[in-house]
Structure formats: structure tokens, C-alpha cells
Amino acid sequence: MDSFFASMTPWPRNDGSLHVYALPDEALRDRLETVSVLLDDVAGLPRMPLSWLHFTVSRLAQFDDIGQAGLTALCDALTRELAGLSPVAVELGAPAPGPVGVTVEAPASPGWDALVAAVRRAAAAVSDDPLPPAPHGPHVSLAYATAPVDDAVVVERLAGATPVGGFTITGLHLVSVTVRPELGTFDWTELASWDLPVG
């Protein structure tokens, strides 16, 4: 496993990147903690703090310096595009190591794809800047590697971990994200939120 932060395309700055997230509720956070603690003290693989666990629906091209008018336009566009979309059920598997971290993943679904598409349409409606790539599917990152990590150590730690199970996404959050490569974490400030269905 290689460093996530060495392989990621650098942001123009490390703070203020606008994202739309879905957030776990307390029950899901408890289930994620059960598998996250299996990674305690793995060198080069700090666990994401439970309060910052999230599903990325889309990273946007804009940063939080777009001003109040820009933020209002973005929120209005998101409200329009999300109108009528229903909550989305996801079925999360067991934690698994990847090339740059450990994730808990769920298969994509028409409902998930509709959420991602709606958010990206809204972002494109208020900015000509090209959007970053969409996420490969619904997932929660439990840990991001900050240095090379022996995959065998991670596989051994996760042996016997069971699927996390079902969760229903009932809301979305527009957030201003800070990446902290020195800590191996992301955190954010919430700017707006929507319950599903909107309207």
C-alpha cells in the first residue's frame, strides 16, 4: 500500500475545497468503529477520526472563497437538482485494503448514481470549471496511508471482519474540506444540508 497523499493530485490549496458528502448516523458510526479499531497502531496508516467519516458524493471544482452570491447560487442549484430524489439504501461490505488506504464499500445503484449526477449537474450549472472525477461508488475510507504500508499486515488485522451492513442515505451536506496530509485525515465545516426527498 502506497501513500494516499503522495499519489493524490494536489489541490490548489489544502483548505476550503467544496464537497458534497453523505454522513453516517450514530448507529453506522458505531458499526464502522468496530472495524476501524482493527487498524489501531498500524504504522503509516492512521485511522480517520469517527466524527470525520463520510461518503463523498462529489468533490466540486470550487473553493469556499466563491462569496455569498456564489454560495447561494450553488445551494439553489443543488436544491433544484435534488428535488424529488429519494433516500438511497447502500449495503456496505467488510473493510478491505486498497492501493492507498482501507475502505468499506457498497455496490453502486441507480439511486446512488442519480444522487451523484444531480450534484454534478448543479455544480456545472454555476461554474465552467471542469469537475474532478466522480467517486467510483459509495464508500467510507477508514484510513489513508501516509507512507508505504505492508499489505500483509493490514490483511492480517482485517481477517475475520464482517460486513458492516445496510445504511440509508437520507440527507446530503455541502462542506468546506481541509486535507491534512501530515495527519492523514480530512475534516470539514458544514455550509448547507438537504434532507431527502428535497421539496
Sequence positions of predicted segments:
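Histidine-dependent nucleotide/RNA phosphoesterase domain, centered on the 2H-phosphoesterase fold
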Residues: 1-199
